[in-house]
UniProtKB/Swiss-Prot annotation:
Catalytic residues in the record: D327 (proton acceptor), R329 (nucleophile)
Transmembrane stretches, start-end: none
Function: Catalyzes the conversion of D-ribulose 5-phosphate to formate and 3,4-dihydroxy-2-butanone 4-phosphate.
Residues binding GTP, per UniProt: R250, V251, H252, S253, E254, Q271, E293, G294, R295, T315, T350, K355
Binding residues for Mg(2+) 1: E27
EC numbers, comma separated: 4.1.99.12, 3.5.4.25
KW Magnesium (keyword) present: yes
DHBP synthase as annotated region, ranges: 1-199
Gene name linked to the record: ribBA
UniProt pathway annotation: Cofactor biosynthesis; riboflavin biosynthesis; 2-hydroxy-3-oxobutyl phosphate from D-ribulose 5-phosphate: step 1/1; Cofactor biosynthesis; riboflavin biosynthesis; 5-amino-6-(D-ribitylamino)uracil from GTP: step 1/4
Amino-acid positions noted as binding D-ribulose 5-phosphate in the UniProt annotation, renumbered to this chain: R26, E27, D31, R138, A139, G140, H141, T142, E162
Listed name of the protein: Riboflavin biosynthesis protein RibBA
UniProt: Zn(2+) binding residues: C255, C266, C268
Species this protein is from: Shouchella clausii (strain KSM-K16)
Amino acid sequence: MFESIDEAITQLKAGGMILVVDDEDRENEGDFLALAETASPETINFMATHGRGLICVPLTEEQAERLQLGQMVSHSTDPHGTAFTVSVDHSHTTTGISAFERAETVRALADANAQPSDFKRPGHVFPLVAKNGGVLRRAGHTEAAVDFAKLCGAKPAGVICEVMNEDGSMARVPELRIIADQHNLPLVTIKDLIAYRRKTEKVVTREVAISLPTEYGDFKAVGYTNTIDGKESVALVKGDVGNGEPVLVRVHSECLTGDVFGSKRCDCGPQLHAALKQIEAEGRGVLLYMKQEGRGIGLINKFRAYKLQEEGYDTVEANERLGFPADLREYGIGAQILRDLGIRDMRLLTNNPRKIAGLEGYDLNIVERVPLQMEAVAENERYLHTKREKLGHMLNL
């Protein structure tokens, strides 16, 4: 069904194009992808004719900052966190819309010697800012384009375009397979790109391991750092988790208010303690504690979201009012930590389908979902209903 990442790299190095599809639980879309530095009028015309989507140029954060490409909007509500900047045309262009002029703009955006003054704003080409760490941090087409460019030894920028069917609907894998065969293009998945990078790169470092006696039992606490954002994470390990048998795992996002202060606004604290109790009872398991306060928006922004909830907004609406997706968490770092601990198959303590998809996208096998439902109280009943209705959490309320 899909070609290998090596085949895709070979095609791109030769100046060609590939088709890249993401996870069916994410956008479930395919994009044409080429290197920005080799973009030609023919590249742009092909994408516009056969892709029919928006032609964008994924860049590194450093290049976008150097070219002074500000965010398209100050508060994005895109649930996938796509980081559009202001659109541009190269200063040498006329209208900027022709395939020839868009190709010139695309190549210039990849040029390490380009200057902010080389571009007119707004324009007809849409830069996107890739997350540092690429698909190991965010499993999107933006990051895939920059990762492929780096793997090719090219300037770290790509050009992408979503693929639609002739009737205007989004092309899914069966249609993308036909298109790839018609035009002799490798069809690859972001999941395979993640696996490829995981085999050749490591972004987490095991720093130190200690014994940690707790009120629930004795654990080994393993401290990790990562090279993407420098954040620290902790794995509380019980027993031998690297023997190949499925391991009971809880990936828990930091919640100062719930975990430490006992806040009743959420169910985080009770979930944390229940997970530790369950792991201790089984005699084997891992609780991974991630620095993802407020579903990834940070402590102060979580307080701002709480303030909006006091004014009548629910937890999802509050995040969106602040310009954040409903859930900003990413699972690549956690997945690498679990693999470092020797875990491949797991029984995941979660109610969140997005967490399942996020970890499986990093080549981890979830053999069972173990529910972790806490009894609702008056203070968090609306919060839990919102998680079920708007975020798809599997809760019985």
